[in-house]
Regions:
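Loop-to-helix entry region at the N-terminal start of transmembrane alpha-helices
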Residues: 13-20, 119-146
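Membrane-helix/interface signature in polytopic inner-membrane proteins
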Residues: 147-180
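Membrane-interface helix termini and inter-helical loops of multi-pass transporters
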Residues: 2-11, 116-130, 238-241
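Short loop segments and helix-boundary regions at transmembrane helix junctions
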Residues: 33-115, 212-223, 240-243, 267-268
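Membrane-interfacial amphipathic/re-entrant helices at transmembrane-helix boundaries
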Residues: 1-26, 273-276
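Cytosolic-side transmembrane-helix boundaries in multi-pass membrane proteins
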Residues: 245-252, 256-280
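Transmembrane alpha-helical segments in multi-pass inner-membrane proteins
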Residues: 198-249
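Loop-to-transmembrane alpha-helix initiation sites
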Residues: 17, 66-73, 92-96, 139, ...
């Protein structure tokens, strides 16, 4: 058993991939509970798709996806925030417009600029292709997300549950909103090479949703979400290695399996509690 677990460590590319998978899984699942609490799943998906034109231009200029992380995240977060704030068509409608138009623009730019990029890797991730520079960047982004989240945890928590109350209390809600959007964009862009544009939402939402089913408090759900997210990433990568499966979809399916187990576990516990009450 130990030999099986250690086998991937014989290869440098697998060591890089495992570190990146852990960092991406932790980064996304850390922000997942906040995203669910604020009903921002659709927004997060739009952010992922909005990265495509930036990636197209960046790759054309000679940058890697990881190197585009922070500047792309800031641009996307600010742009989305401004569009939603200054339009009267409704938040979901504005996000839907951004989602589809930016995704379409990305493919047009890839064609016009004659960018050499593997679309399957872009959409579903190709973690096995990460280099040492990508590893340093993704780990640095994880540290940045953790530090900022810990520093502003109480404010983000208050704003997440009660935006109006936070504003009444004197918190700068505009700053907190853009701060979270930037953190979310950083996590998404930093994880694109791991799970791709299509599946990044699954690694953001599913571990957090599973954690919500098995915990009683929001703070506890964050810790459990990170645990589920990292387990999903590492286990998915192991499955990819031993069964020759695509890494991104494997991670997503492991996360889904954890969610199903958590869901069934809660149902069983609930039935057990009702049976105990009935007998009493």
């Amino acid at each position: 058993m130990i030999e099986i677990l250690l086998d991937p460590f014989r290869y440098d590319f697998m060591i890089r991939s495992l570190i990146t998978a852990f960092a991406s899984g932790a980064m996304l699942s850390l922000l997942g509970p906040f995203t669910i609490n604020r009903n921002m799943g659709f927004m997060a998906d739009a952010m992922a798709h909005a990265t495509l034109p930036i990636i197209a231009v960046g790759v054309f200029l000679g940058f890697s996806i990881s190197e585009l992380g922070v500047p792309a995240a800031i641009l996307i977060a600010i742009f989305l925030g401004l569009i939603i704030k200054n339009t009267n068509v409704g938040e979901d409608t504005a996000i839907g417009i951004i989602f589809s138009s930016f995704f379409a623009l990305g493919f047009v730019l890839i064609s016009l600029l004659n960018v050499t990029v593997n679309l399957e890797d872009l959409l579903f991730g190709q973690i096995l292709a990460v280099n040492i520079s990508d590893v340093y960047i993704v780990v640095s982004l994880l540290i940045l997300v953790i530090l900022v989240t810990v520093t502003y945890f109480k404010q983000l928590l208050f704003y997440s549950f009660d935006p109006i109350g936070a504003e009444v209390k004197g918190l700068n809600t505009t700053f907190l909103n853009y701060l979270f959007l930037i953190l979310l964009s950083i996590a998404i862009v930093g994880s694109l090479q791991t799970v791709g544009i299509i599946l990044v939402l699954s690694m953001l939402i599913i571990p957090a949703a599973a954690a919500k089913l098995v915990t009683e408090t929001f703070t506890a759900s964050i810790g459990v979400s990170v645990l589920f997210g990292t387990i999903s990433s590492i286990t998915g990568l192991y499955l990819s290695y031993f069964l020759n499966l695509p890494s991104g979809p494997s991670m997503s399916l492991v996360a889904t399996t954890i969610f199903v187990i958590a869901f069934l576990s809660k149902k069983i516990r609930k039935k057990g509690s009702l049976a105990t009450v009935t007998v009493s």
